[in-house]
């Protein structure tokens, strides 16, 4: 179920936290996937009669969950994504009441289904069929076995898969979590990815090409836009309604948000509430629910640091299992294997391709900016070349000390040392010339010999060259 009304609330009140992105944004990323969510989608395909709806093995058991999971997983690999599948463990005690309600709803749906079948009401049949879906242990085991044959890591959570995914993401073992349930945010997932199904909507890239669209939600932006702390956000989700407790009548997401902004926490809100207008449900142990969200039963991420490994797929074992035990056609399996082989190493290649080819769409404004940038670069290059030429000329003019461009630290130190000698000699030379000119001005032709300036310059240059050679 997730958090009631949270998705719509975020769209209206924290729109900056939700971004539409192309699947190319996940190239090379490790993504944790809530496996049960995907399995539910493919089992629902049976009821809706889609492309996986009528697939069974020789025993008459549905294989739509296998076919759907295999096909979508290969699509992930072809897109350069590295998936990690996380499966649910034992549900927390606080969820038992919700699970009992779900069981009752399935039983009621089964009764409605039988009635609709008798009446031939196809629309009601379709709706009630979907409501009777329940993932079995055998179906989960099938998918786990298939993923291991593909060489993809599989994690079995101690309790809620979404809590385990959040732990992996918070500790940096995965980039984001792919799920459709909003309570992944409540467990503290920094980045939630929705619609990673290659079918929901399209996204136009910089070149105008239509690509599969993802919805990415950043928790940090959610909190900053709403002006809430993480604990206040958890309280907001509890008040909205979740799988672990009942809801307060008359309080939806927006009302809960306004109350939290005013009173800061659930405790104060409950004390200030008009109990006649907003009676508390029988099961509303918000303290335990808050603890479950903030400190869930998970395997610590450090346990997986050396275990999240992608191995070479066992294509022979996969083919044999699909053909002999699941009644897949040989042609179909051969096609799967070919795609898996081609996807191998896709991550590195697609990363390079995207780095060199993904360029912003050129508009008239962008073109003008590019021209300005080009002009600035040309000016910088011209100045740089002038500086280099000046440096080379000044050095060569004073004894051809160095003609190559300074490239290393040693070259730079050598250049500075030589240049210092040159500057000192220039200064001394100027002082000598000034002194000689002063002598000539203050002396008569009879008592002062004429100084040969040309000879003096040659003498200074010779002395300078000798000093440089000595230093070398």
Swiss-Prot record:
Alphabetical list of PROSITE patterns matching this protein: XPG_1 (PS00841)
Molecular function per GO: 5'-3' exonuclease activity; 5'-flap endonuclease activity; DNA binding; magnesium ion binding
Co-factor remark: Binds 2 magnesium ions per subunit. They probably participate in the reaction catalyzed by the enzyme. May bind an additional third magnesium ion after substrate binding.
Processing after translation: Phosphorylated. Phosphorylation upon DNA damage induces relocalization to the nuclear plasma.
Cofactors demanded by this protein: Mg(2+)
Binding site for DNA: 47, 72, 160, 241, 243
Region (N-domain): 1-106
InterPro entries listed in its UniProt record: 5-3_exonuclease, 5-3_exonuclease_C_sf, Flap_endonuc, HhH2, PIN-like_dom_sf, XPG-I_dom, XPG/Rad2, XPG_CS
Record keywords, A-Z: DNA damage, DNA repair, DNA replication, Endonuclease, Exonuclease, Hydrolase, Magnesium, Metal-binding, Mitochondrion, Nuclease, Nucleus, Phosphoprotein
Entry superkingdom: Eukaryota
Biological processes, Gene Ontology terms: base-excision repair; DNA replication, removal of RNA primer
Binding site for Mg(2+) 1: 34, 88, 160, 162
Segments of this protein annotated with the region I-domain: 124-263
Binding site for Mg(2+) 2: 181, 183, 243
Main location: nucleus
Keyword Phosphoprotein tagged: yes
Family classification: Belongs to the XPG/RAD2 endonuclease family. FEN1 subfamily.
Oligomer and partners: Interacts with PCNA. Three molecules of FEN1 bind to one PCNA trimer with each molecule binding to one PCNA monomer. PCNA stimulates the nuclease activity without altering cleavage specificity.
Role: Structure-specific nuclease with 5'-flap endonuclease and 5'-3' exonuclease activities involved in DNA replication and repair. During DNA replication, cleaves the 5'-overhanging flap structure that is generated by displacement synthesis when DNA polymerase encounters the 5'-end of a downstream Okazaki fragment. It enters the flap from the 5'-end and then tracks to cleave the flap base, leaving a nick for ligation. Also involved in the long patch base excision repair (LP-BER) pathway, by cleaving within the apurinic/apyrimidinic (AP) site-terminated flap.
The protein's name: Flap endonuclease 1
């Amino acid at each position: 179920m997730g958090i009631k009304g949270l998705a719509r609330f975020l769209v209206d009140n924290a729109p900056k936290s939700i971004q539409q992105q192309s699947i190319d944004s996940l190239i090379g990323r490790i993504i944790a996937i809530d496996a049960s969510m995907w399995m539910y989608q493919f089992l629902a395909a049976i009821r809706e009669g889609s492309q996986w709806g009528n697939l069974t093995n020789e025993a008459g058991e549905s294989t739509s969950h296998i076919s759907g999971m295999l096909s979508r997983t290969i699509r992930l690999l072809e897109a350069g994504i590295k998936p990690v599948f996380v499966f649910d463990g034992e549900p927390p005690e606080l969820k038992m009441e919700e699970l009992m309600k779900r069981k009752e709803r399935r039983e009621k749906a089964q009764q409605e289904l039988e009635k609709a079948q008798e009446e031939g009401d196809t629309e009601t049949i379709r709706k009630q069929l979907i409501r009777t879906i329940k993932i079995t242990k055998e179906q989960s085991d099938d998918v786990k076995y298939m993923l291991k044959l593909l060489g993809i890591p599989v994690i079995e959570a101690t309790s809620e898969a979404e809590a385990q995914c959040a732990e992996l993401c918070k500790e940096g073992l995965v980039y984001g979590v792919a799920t459709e349930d909003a309570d992944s945010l409540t467990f503290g997932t920094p980045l939630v990815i929705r619609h990673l199904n290659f079918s929901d909507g399209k996204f136009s890239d910089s070149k105008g090409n239509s690509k599969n669209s993802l919805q990415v939600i950043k928790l940090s932006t959610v909190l900053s836009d709403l002006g809430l702390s993480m604990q206040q956000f958890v309280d907001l989700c509890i008040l909205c309604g979740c799988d672990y407790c009942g809801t307060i009548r008359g309080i939806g997401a927006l009302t809960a948000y306004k109350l939290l902004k005013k009173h800061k926490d659930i405790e104060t809100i409950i004390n200030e509430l008009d109990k006649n207008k907003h009676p508390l449900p029988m099961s509303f142990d918000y303290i335990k629910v808050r603890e479950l969200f903030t400190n869930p039963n998970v395997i610590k991420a450090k346990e997986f640091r050396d275990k999240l490994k992608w191995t070479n797929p066992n294509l022979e074992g996969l083919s044999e299992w699909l053909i002999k035990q699941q009644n897949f056609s040989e042609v179909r399996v051969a096609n799967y294997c070919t795609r898996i082989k081609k996807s191998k190493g896709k991550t590195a290649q697609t990363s390079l391709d995207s780095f060199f080819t993904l360029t912003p769409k050129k508009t008239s404004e962008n073109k003008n900016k590019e021209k300005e940038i080009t002009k600035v670069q040309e000016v910088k290059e011209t100045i740089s070349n002038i500086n280099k030429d000046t440096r080379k000329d000044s050095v060569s003019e004073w004894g051809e000390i160095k003609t190559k461009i300074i490239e290393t630290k040693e070259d730079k130190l050598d250049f500075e040392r030589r240049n210092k000698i040159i500057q000192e000699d220039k200064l001394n030379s100027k002082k000598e010339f000034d002194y000689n000119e002063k002598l000539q001005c203050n002396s008569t032709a009879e008592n002062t010999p004429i100084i040969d300036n040309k000879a003096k310059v040659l003498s200074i240059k010779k002395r300078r060259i000798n000093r440089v050679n000595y230093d070398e």
